[in-house]
């Protein structure tokens, strides 16, 4: 039976040393599921509420004991004897129990921990890996996603002078996920050597990418191209580039303030800036190219380069189906970043992915800068045919854990394993 017998939560630490919530669900048949909730550094203003204690004498106010108490009290009592196999019904019960639009009463971190742990428990009860169980919910084919490997960190993810938050390599020319992972790793090694050769720091940021100071943002791209070539790969063929601009972080009074470039640009000027980069470099994906409230700027960018580049809404859409629909209806962006803690339940996460695919938008399953050893997002990416995953660089075990889970899934699929590769960008004409 998949009836819930017990729910338990605790406070643990994430990869930045901040408290986060971990939940466990035990079923009547003894099956057990556990999930830990991630946390972001650069966050959209419309994200579901991550409930923090606010007690400055404890973890500088970042404790999550209130959220833990909500799980161990109200949520555990309400869901006892509920059938965890009814994921949609369980998540609806959680949403109704919270009763707020932004999940601010009980906390999205409380709801999400239980939602994900319940799915793990049902998968265990059915003696299925999580990805296989989730694929029965989504009724999707399965595929190994293209990893978007964040090898240079900037912005809110690093203490350097780089304005843009992430510079990524995408090994689209490989024949399997394992080969793609090898390519990314070899480029990461090569980049370290190149940075040392230029006398630059090889310290890493929150997501495991290198975080040196550069003379300009574009120097980061040039350095990555050098590393790709040194590793024996061809940029534009084997490897494409991706950016997370995270422009809401430097958008102020209607201008984009690029400290590293000593420029303050209007939306039109910043669109020109990004379009010039697209013309000069093998960039296939730009995330949060414009600020979350600059819908007019987003439309300009979409009209300018949207046929040639994947334009990903993260802060713009915050994995929220209601907000995402506005983007679809207005033809804004052409892809959505999927972060489970932005919306707060598994069901709503899967709904956002399904909505993207129905509208011919790409979906990218993503980690947060504050992560744990939890690997749930790897299974979600495979089970939904998301075709792309963002889970950081090639160091820090909180990032590598997801890559290792994808290796396990690829091995389990055997001859049925399919790597998305270039097919992930079939609608993009470069």
Swiss-Prot record:
Chemical reaction(s) catalysed: (2R)-2-phosphoglycerate = phosphoenolpyruvate + H2O
Pathway involvement of the protein, from the record: Carbohydrate degradation; glycolysis; pyruvate from D-glyceraldehyde 3-phosphate: step 4/5
GO cellular component: cell surface; extracellular region; phosphopyruvate hydratase complex
Pfam families for the chain: Enolase_C (PF00113), Enolase_N (PF03952)
Binding note for cofactor: Binds a second Mg(2+) ion via substrate during catalysis.
UniProt-annotated location(s): Cytoplasm; Secreted; Cell surface
Organism domain of life: Bacteria
Keywords, sorted A to Z: Cytoplasm, Glycolysis, Lyase, Magnesium, Metal-binding, Secreted
Sites where the protein binds (2R)-2-phosphoglycerate: 165, 339, 368-369, 390
Residues annotated to bind Mg(2+): 244, 287, 314
One GO MF term: phosphopyruvate hydratase activity
Catalytic site positions: 207 (proton donor), 339 (proton acceptor)
EC number: 4.2.1.11
Chain's role: Catalyzes the reversible conversion of 2-phosphoglycerate (2-PG) into phosphoenolpyruvate (PEP). It is essential for the degradation of carbohydrates via glycolysis.
Family: Belongs to the enolase family.
Name assigned to this protein: Enolase
Organism in which the protein naturally occurs: Xanthomonas oryzae pv. oryzae (strain KACC10331 / KXO85)
Taxonomic lineage from the root: Bacteria, Pseudomonadati, Pseudomonadota, Gammaproteobacteria, Lysobacterales
Gene responsible for this protein: eno
């Amino acid at each position: 039976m998949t009836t819930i017998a017990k729910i338990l939560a605790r406070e643990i630490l994430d990869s930045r040393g901040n408290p986060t919530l971990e939940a466990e669900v035990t079923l009547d048949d003894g099956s057990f599921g556990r999930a830990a909730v991630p946390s972001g550094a650069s966050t959209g203003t419309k994200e579901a509420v991550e409930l923090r204690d606010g007690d400055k004498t404890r973890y500088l106010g970042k404790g999550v004991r209130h959220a833990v108490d909500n799980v161990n009290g109200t949520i555990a009592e309400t869901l006892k004897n509920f059938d965890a196999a009814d994921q949609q019904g369980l998540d609806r019960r959680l949403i109704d129990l919270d009763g707020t639009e932004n999940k601010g009463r009980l906390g999205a971190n409380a709801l999400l921990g239980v939602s994900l742990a319940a799915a793990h428990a049902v998968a265990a009860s059915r003696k299925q890996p999580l990805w296989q169980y989730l694929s029965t919910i989504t009724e999707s084919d399965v595929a190994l996603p293209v990893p978007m490997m964040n090898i240079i960190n900037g912005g809110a993810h690093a203490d350097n002078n780089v304005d843009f938050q992430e510079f990524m390599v995408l090994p689209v020319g490989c024949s399997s996920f394992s080969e793609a992972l090898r390519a990314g790793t070899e480029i990461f090694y090569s980049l370290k050597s190149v940075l040392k050769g230029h006398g630059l720091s090889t310290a890493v940021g929150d997501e495991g990418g290198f975080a040196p100071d550069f003379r300009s943002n574009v120097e980061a791209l040039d350095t990555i191209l050098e590393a790709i070539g040194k590793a024996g790969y061809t940029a534009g063929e084997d490897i494409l580039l991706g950016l997370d601009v995270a422009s809401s972080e430097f958008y102020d009074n209607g201008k984009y303030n690029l400290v590293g470039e000593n420029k303050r640009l209007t939306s039109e000027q910043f669109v020109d800036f990004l379009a010039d980069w697209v013309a000069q470099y093998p960039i296939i994906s730009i995330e949060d190219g414009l600020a979350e409230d600059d819908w007019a700027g987003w439309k300009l960018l979409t009209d300018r380069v949207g046929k040639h580049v994947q334009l990903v809404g993260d802060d713009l859409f915050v994995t929220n189906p209601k907000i995402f629909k506005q983007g679809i209806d207005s033809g804004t962006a052409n892809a959505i970043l999927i972060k489970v803690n932005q919306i707060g339940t598994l069901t709503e996460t899967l709904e956002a992915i399904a909505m993207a695919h129905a509208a011919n938008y790409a979906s990218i399953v993503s980690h947060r800068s504050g992560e744990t050893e939890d690997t749930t997002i790897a299974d979600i990416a495979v089970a939904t045919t998301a075709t792309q995953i963002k889970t950081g660089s090639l160091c820090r075990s909180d990032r590598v854990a997801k890559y290792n889970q994808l290796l396990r899934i690829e091995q389990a699929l055997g001859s049925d394993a399919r790597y998305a590769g270039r097919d992930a960008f079939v609608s993009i004409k470069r």
